[in-house]
Amino acid sequence: MVAEDAPVRATCRVLFRTTTLIFLCTLLALSISILYESLITQKQIMSQAGSTGSNSGLGSITDLLNNILSVANQIIYNSAVALPLQLDTLESTLLTAIKSLQTSDKLEQNCSWSAALINDNRYINGINQFYFSIAEGRNLTLGPLLNMPSFIPTATTPEGCTRIPSFSLTKTHWCYTHNVILNGCQDHVSSNQFVSMGIIEPTSAGFPFFRTLKTLYLSDGVNRKSCSISTVPGGCMMYCFVSTQPERDDYFSAAPPEQRIIIMYYNDTIVERIINPPGVLDVWATLNPGTGSGVYYLGWVLFPIYGGVIKGTSLWNNQANKYFIPQMVAALCSQNQATQVQNAKSSYYSSWFGNRMIQSGILACPLRQDLTNECLVLPFSNDQVLMGAEGRLYMYGDSVYYYQRSNSWWPMTMLYKVTITFTNGQPSAISAQNVPTQQVPRPGTGDCSATNRCPGFCLTGVYADAWLLTNPSSTSTFGSEATFTGSYLNTATQRINPTMYIANNTQIISSQQFGSSGQEAAYGHTTCFRDTGSVMVYCIYIIELSSSLLGQFQIVPFIRQVTLS
């Protein structure tokens, strides 16, 4: 797919939705007109024939309205449910056919063929879904680690450092990026950015292999930081900010650092834009990508964000006195209710970060090349999420979910279902619904360790996202039982003991630690997918591991099967 295809597809979607809305509005207007004429006629009949004919007249009107409503409901169902499902099925069929043609071609001896940017047929229909029922989720175990070549390069000197991975996977392909620091792990001085894209293919042993088809090394003197990546049709989109000062200094600034969007297509087209989203200047002191991956949703690319909001601004005032306390806290915290509320309210404000309000949200950008003022910043309401932090967005079918790093006082994995409201064809508001869980804890310092259960001010933790294996919406009460997998650091206060796990709301079901006790580690990213040929579910756990040989950290992808026992 070439770069120009994306705007055409977006335009077609807009035309279809606009036509549908116009048709529905026309139908509504006709219905009102018919109803009005019917009422006038009925009034005339009643004045001439008395009340004897009223019942039959009302009955005919009721039948007429029922017929109109039935037609309207069928149109709404077809446009909102049936047609998208048919399009999704058609897309999968076309992708499978294209991949089949590409892999079956026998090439002439002197010809070359560039592999199509499409995953193997076995995986196309097994990506970005919930893979198990609620009952099956209770009986899952981790399979052994599988040996595959790493698609992630490491540092090549003892002084080098690779950090902050971001990975995105869709039906067609995957995108990956990380920061490369030449000396030490402080990314605010000078760093480069590694980017790659590729596909999933099966090995002769039957398990998947991540094949790299394109790489890009951004080494141009621009210090891009905390980049989030998302797959888009035909390539990758990456969101970074540019800064050459420590994180704390960013929060004390009067204006946010430079924001950049980079679009890299498989046909070697590269577009980079400095963006200026409306409502950011004079409101946000700093605005940062969430480092976790974004998603492509209804023609828009969504990225997780967080940053510091300036006191007295409209956003600050709108969030005043808002707070969120996860459902599980009531049974686990010994503080009285008033103390919990007071501490929860104050947890969003940091004197260490210049008394800014630490806020989470979503950056939404349309998929087109002229993005200077097109991207939008959508903040979460703080009565639905905790203090702002790094994060990740997921697509499960047609639903968007959000992971928020547990920087604040609640140490458990924070996952939310996100609802996005569109106005005039563009996203205008977001809301979040938390998946209640008292697992899996992250390490933290002081009173904010993995054992803490009560509200208070914290600025700690580590990024450790998780993949939902079951659908939280499948239960009568949202999220009352959910199973997920990921990696965490199995200690109360230190970044050590990386452990891969499967857990539900209340307990860890299966786990396996990597390396010896005391192995240092940091960020962890998890993504799962299904081989529809063997019906096996695989998960890739991307973990930052400390190294005594090459660099302070190496980023390692581990792959293993999740099995139903």
From Swiss-Prot:
Intravirion side: 1-19
Cited SUPFAM superfamilies: Sialidases
Gene Ontology biological-process annotations: symbiont entry into host cell; viral budding from plasma membrane; virion attachment to host cell
Main localization of the protein described in the UniProt heading: virion
EC annotation from Swiss-Prot or TrEMBL: 3.2.1.18
Region of interest: Involved in neuraminidase activity: 223-228
GO molecular function: exo-alpha-sialidase activity; host cell surface receptor binding; identical protein binding
SS bond list: 161-185, 175-236, 227-240, 333-454, 365-375, 448-458, 528-539
Sugar-bearing residue positions: 139, 267, 504
Keywords: Disulfide bond, Glycoprotein, Hemagglutinin, Host cell membrane, Host membrane, Host-virus interaction, Hydrolase, Membrane, Signal-anchor, Transmembrane, Transmembrane helix, Viral attachment to host cell, Viral envelope protein, Virion, Virus entry into host cell
UniProt subcellular location: Virion membrane; Host cell membrane
Domain notes: The C-terminus (head domain) is involved in binding the cellular receptor.
Assembly and binders: Homotetramer; composed of disulfide-linked homodimers. Interacts with F protein trimer.
Name of the protein: Hemagglutinin-neuraminidase
